[in-house]
UniProtKB/Swiss-Prot annotation:
This is UPF0291 protein LJ_1507. One of its GO terms (cellular component) is cytoplasm. It comes from Lactobacillus johnsonii (strain CNCM I-12250 / La1 / NCC 533). Its main location: cytoplasm. Residues 61-82 are annotated as: Disordered. The lineage of its organism: Bacteria, Bacillati, Bacillota, Bacilli, Lactobacillales. PANTHER family: UPF0291 PROTEIN CBO2609/CLC_2481, UPF0291 PROTEIN YNZC.
Length: 82
């Protein structure tokens, strides 16, 4: 999902939230809100996972202490040679 799509998604979620404060949402609006929220969370989680998988952790002594799970993900992406 690109930046513009995400902005539109958030805008529509916020519109539905505003409407819900003024009146009850229709069944169609409730379903739309549910789908939009699900899409937003899926995109957020994917971005967060990407960020975590690309992170290298170094302790105060300069030794890498990245988790094995993260190292494996980095190897699959071709970011690590070891």
């Amino acid at each position: 999902m690109d930046k513009k799509e995400e902005e539109n998604l958030i805008k529509r979620i916020n519109e539905l939230t505003k409407i819900s404060r003024e009146r009850e949402l229709t069944p169609d609006e409730l379903e739309e809100r549910k789908k939009l929220r699900s899409a937003f969370l899926e995109n957020f989680r994917a971005g967060f996972r990407q960020q975590l998988e690309d992170t290298v952790v170094i302790d105060k002594d300069g030794k890498e202490v990245t988790s094995e799970k993260a190292k494996e993900a980095q190897r699959r992406k071709g970011l690590r040679k070891d």
